[in-house]
Amino acid sequence: MPFSERRKYPRVPEAVTCQVSVGVERFQTLTQNLSCGGTLCSLSEEVAPMTKLEVVLDLPASLGAVRVPRQSVRCVGVVIRQDRLPLEDRPSYLTAIYFTDLKPEDRRRIGEFVLQSMFSHDRRRS
């Protein structure tokens, strides 16, 4: 049986500065990958699945040779899954976040960033 990708949006392996808030607790982190549908990042605390989070992504001002203005994207998401990273000195949890409330213009900004990143990665391979 052939493999079928279930993701609705393409994702890219980009480290984007990200602030995640759970109630009054805030975590500063970097994404490991990003799409219009969500992100994967590392958090220092365990967060239960389906916990609602506030996410602020600081999309970079440039990506390779492509120059774009720096943009912040704010949205709401939920934790889909979390896996403890085994070889860390301090607790660290790889956290998958699904964006549940994202303004259309912010989804477009992330989409443009993802496309530029994909283009940049393709150019590096050729």
Would you name each region that the model predicts?
Residues 1-34, 42-46, 111-126:
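N-terminal helix initiation/capping motif
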Residues 13, 66-76:
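Short coil-to-beta-strand transition motifs
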Residues 23, 36, 82-88:
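Short, conserved beta-turn/loop elements at beta-strand boundaries and strand-helix junctions
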Residues 29-30, 75-82:
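Short beta-strand-centered aromatic/proline hotspots
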Residues 34, 46, 80-82, 102:
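Residue-level recognition of beta-strand microenvironments
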Residues 86-126:
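C-terminal output/interaction extensions
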